């Protein structure tokens, strides 16, 4: 795993296909670490999106993907999975000529699918960021196909590290587990916070007090996990005194099957990722990117 980088990202022109929240986060991170706005090109179908990107970052924006990728050696695909086959088909001829490094942050899209849709013989990195990446506090799982050389891996890592930590996976089949462990996982924490708030309010605490208590506890616990160097199990043991209040709560969680429920939920998330990948193939084969 790497920590978020502070040094400049290697030079070169980067084209973003898609100008949504994730693209904005990465663009802001790149510029903050020394990438010239003139080296970033963005295609977005919406005029208001293009105008906002120009205003906020000073980057060049385009309505045409073919124009946006011209002269770029890194293509960042940040569009919805269901439109990816059509977007790639539009760029296949340019990809065959330019041989770019293609980086996809679309969920459920495999490197084989990207390479095939772009016409073959393309270096592809598959990235799975999570939503805290939009705050520069996320983590991204990365997988590179065999056509990506070490320089390409470093370049992809440098771009995604502007949004948080990075973890490289050497077996692409495990990217669905990355989705389960981090891509979807912020929602698990949100659900826990929601349940804790509801329980605190049910016990009589005012809603604003319940929210502050729960959110600051989650934030503090996360800092302890990242800064202490101790395992989650060890930290839990340290605050769980036999016969105490924490012990009563933890025992209730364990008897209620919390571990098994988490394992089932994460397993279902990974399974759903595989199902979506297969559906992407079906969509592309039908010729209907919608």
Model-derived features: positions:
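NAD(P)+-binding Rossmann beta1-loop-alpha1 motif at the extreme N-terminus of oxidoreductases
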Residues: 1-71, 201-203
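NAD(P)-dependent Rossmann-like dehydrogenase/reductase catalytic/cofactor-binding core
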Residues: 2, 8, 215-290
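Short pre-catalytic strand/loop immediately N-terminal to key active-site residues, enriched for Gly-Thr
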Residues: 14, 125, 174-180, 232-237
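Rossmann-like NAD(P)(H) cofactor-binding subdomain of soluble oxidoreductases
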Residues: 26-27, 47, 57, 65-142, ...
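Small-residue helix-packing motif on alpha-helices
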Residues: 40, 50, 68, 114, ...
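Internal alpha-helical scaffold of NAD(P)-dependent oxidoreductase catalytic cores
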Residues: 113-123, 139-177, 188-227, 272
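Catalytic, metal-anchored helix/loop core of enzyme active sites in primary metabolism
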Residues: 181, 193, 279-282
């Amino acid at each position: 795993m790497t920590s978020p980088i502070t040094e400049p990202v290697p030079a070169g022109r980067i084209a973003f296909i898609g100008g949504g929240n994730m693209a904005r986060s990465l663009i802001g991170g790149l510029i903050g670490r020394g990438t010239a706005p003139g080296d970033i090109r963005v295609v977005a179908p919406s005029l208001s999106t293009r105008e906002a990107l120009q205003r906020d970052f000073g980057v060049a924006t385009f309505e045409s993907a073919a124009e946006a990728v011209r002269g770029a050696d890194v293509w960042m695909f940040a569009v919805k999975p269901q439109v990816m086959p059509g977007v790639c088909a539009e760029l296949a001829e340019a990809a065959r000529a330019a041989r770019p490094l293609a980086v996809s942050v679309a969920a459920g899209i495999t490197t084989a699918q990207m390479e095939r849709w772009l016409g073959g013989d393309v270096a592809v990195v598959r990235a799975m960021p999570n939503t805290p990446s939009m705050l520069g506090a996320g983590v991204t799982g990365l997988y590179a196909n065999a056509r990506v050389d070490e320089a390409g891996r470093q370049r992809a890592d440098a771009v995604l590290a502007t949004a948080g930590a990075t973890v490289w996976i050497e077996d692409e089949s495990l990217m669905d587990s990355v989705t389960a462990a981090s891509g979807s996982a912020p929602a698990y924490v949100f659900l826990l916070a929601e349940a804790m708030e509801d329980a605190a309010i049910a016990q009589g605490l005012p809603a604003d007090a319940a929210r502050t208590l729960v959110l600051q506890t989650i934030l503090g616990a996360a800092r302890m996990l990242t800064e202490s160097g101790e395992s989650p199990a060890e930290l839990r043991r340290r605050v769980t005194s036999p016969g105490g209040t924490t012990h009563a709560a933890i025992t209730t969680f364990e008897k209620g099957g919390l571990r098994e429920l988490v394992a089932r939920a994460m397993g279902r998330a990974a399974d759903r990722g595989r199902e979506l990948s297969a559906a992407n193939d079906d969509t592309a084969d039908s010729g209907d990117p919608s």
